[in-house]
Design a protein with these regions (language model features):
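ATP-binding glycine-rich loop module of kinase domains
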Residues: 11-53, 84-86
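Short, exposed beta-strand/loop patches in secreted or surface proteins that constitute
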Residues: 15-21, 61-66, 152
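Juxta-kinase regulatory segment immediately upstream of eukaryotic protein kinase catalytic domains
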Residues: 1-5
Length: 247
């Protein structure tokens, strides 16, 4: 299995390969598509070490990463994602239990990422834009913004986080991480729409005006990933001269 992440800026373009060794063991490998992306891939080793120390306080393990040349080799983890676990609870109508489980992980994010007051840095502005944020937000020095239910693996005796590629070594408000957890679970599957009446954003302390800012941050982040590259889904708008009405 190979997944290409090539609709990106050249310095971020990679592919992910899952392969099986002679002994049947599966491994995951992230490889730069361009020489410019080698530093991005090699950085995963440093990120793994940093997150391992951070997540230890909440008894969360990090998918182990080993750098070989310009490639990152990661263990292939088995288990069920938190996203799938939440979906099973939803299908069984156990929405109270779903909410309790989901918010236990939201609390873990807050415990890990609320160590000091947030202040904007030039690095933050470069990725997320010079957005107008509340003054009471908290953060840490390192921010894995992709700590979403699909990237959390639950097994019999441990909880692990995978796919931590979008970890930044500068402060990002913890509330933005919580926003992404909720957004990427609630908004990307119609069957989860019934949960919107449970007001997850409000219960997490996220106000409508906060959401407006976080939508802008997410847009700026996606533009940072693209760089000068134009994604196929956006290409028509750029090359089409527009519609002409013919009578």
């Amino acid at each position: 299995y190979v997944k290409f992440s090539n609709e990106r800026d050249q310095k971020l373009s990679i592919y992910t390969e899952i392969s099986e060794a002679a002994d049947g063991q599966l491994t995951v490998k992230k490889v730069p598509l361009q020489k410019k992306a080698a530093a991005h891939v090699r950085n995963l080793g440093t990120i793994c070490e940093e997150l391992t120390g951070m997540y230890k306080e909440e008894e969360i393990e990090v998918n182990r990463c080993r750098i070989k040349g310009d490639c990152a080799q990661l263990e292939y983890l088995t288990g069920i994602t938190l996203e799938d676990k939440l979906d099973h609870l939803l299908e069984e109508g156990r929405t109270e239990e779903l909410e309790k489980l989901f918010f236990s992980y939201i609390q873990k994010v807050k415990n890990i990422h609320e160590k000091k007051p947030f202040e904007k840095t030039p690095e933050f502005v470069r990725v997320f834009g010079n957005v107008n944020l509340r003054s009471d937000l908290k953060c840490t020095e390192i921010s894995n913004i992709d700590f979403v239910p699909a990237n959390i693996i639950l097994s019999e005796n441990k909880v692990s986080v995978i796919d931590y590629e979008w970890t930044f070594t500068f402060p990002v408000p913890s509330q933005f991480l919580v926003y992404r957890m909720i957004f990427y679970y609630l908004e990307l599957n119609d069957k989860r729409g019934i949960l919107k009446e449970r007001d997850f954003y409000e219960k997490a302390g996220i106000l409508p005006e906060d959401i407006e800012v976080y939508v802008e941050m997410e847009h700026n982040f996606q533009q940072y990933i693209l760089g000068e590259h134009t994604a196929m889904r956006n290409m028509y708008a750029q090359i089409s001269p527009g519609r002409v009405e013919v009578e």
